Amino acid sequence: MLRKHIKIESARWYYHCDRLGMLVWQDAVSGGGTDGEYNAWTTNRKPTLIRSTWNKFRDDTAKHFTALGADDPIYRRDWSRTCDAMVHMLGGHPSIVTWTLFNEGWGQFDACDAAERIHALDPTRPIDATSGWYDQHCGDYHSVHNYFRPLEIYPDKGPLRGYVAEFEKKHRRRRRAAHYVVLPVARHGVRAFVISEFGGLAQLVPEHAAVSRAYGYGEYDSIDDWRAAVRSVLASAAALESRGLAGYVYTQVSDVEEELNGLLTYDRRVDKFAE
């Protein structure tokens, strides 16, 4: 599975995913901010340092619009139109199995309203309304990013909202009617818990990078040490499957312009993981 992160590719890319049977989580393009910048405390430092904020920070008031870089009404209108257009344009590709709406609070606003609207446009695919943090208790996933803490499954706190709340009611009625009990790992047992970003371990390959210094997580004396660290964090994620983890997305397939945490180099000429 690939998560196409905050960008849309050409039709050719999706054609090849369709042809190969690759599953794609498609992100909406992020926007908002002031001159392309977000409030570093709200969208990065606070959720990194204080995990308890993830389920408590709203996104549907003027105050929160400003904090999340979504205070411009023209931006909010344009983002909504663009997100709808993405679903219309790409909805015919069977490779796409999830729509991701907001990432790490960047320009996030009214995530539950957005999830309801996209669900009405395409009821066939699950929706990751808020990937990373600032969960609004809606959409089909409880979706977190975890780069700095031991990997674990967090309980789904708070009453669910929107179409998934209606699904939960029906689910409970069916369970009562069938006279059986399910003991879910998450509190509600309706939304899937996913770690939608983790890892991000950096390794520079000289002459195959767009930047000269590594941006990513961890420092390794050799590429063998880096490979061992990648295997370890992947094994930690896989071990959570038996406890209810529904999926995970390692960061990332390749180095990009300012990051050296890919499994492939920026020019795609070196597979760092190949021994």
Regions found by a protein language model. Name each.
Residues 146-156:
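A polyampholytic, Gly/Pro-enriched intrinsically disordered region
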Residues 1-141, 145-148, 186-189, 271:
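Active-site mouth of glycoside hydrolases
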Residues 80-81, 95-99, 155-275:
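Substrate-binding clefts and catalytic carboxylate motifs of secreted carbohydrate-active enzymes
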Residues 37, 139-140, 154-155, 205-206:
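Short, well-ordered secondary-structure micro-motifs
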Residues 106, 134, 148-149, 199-202, ...:
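Short, solvent-exposed loop/turn segments at secondary-structure junctions
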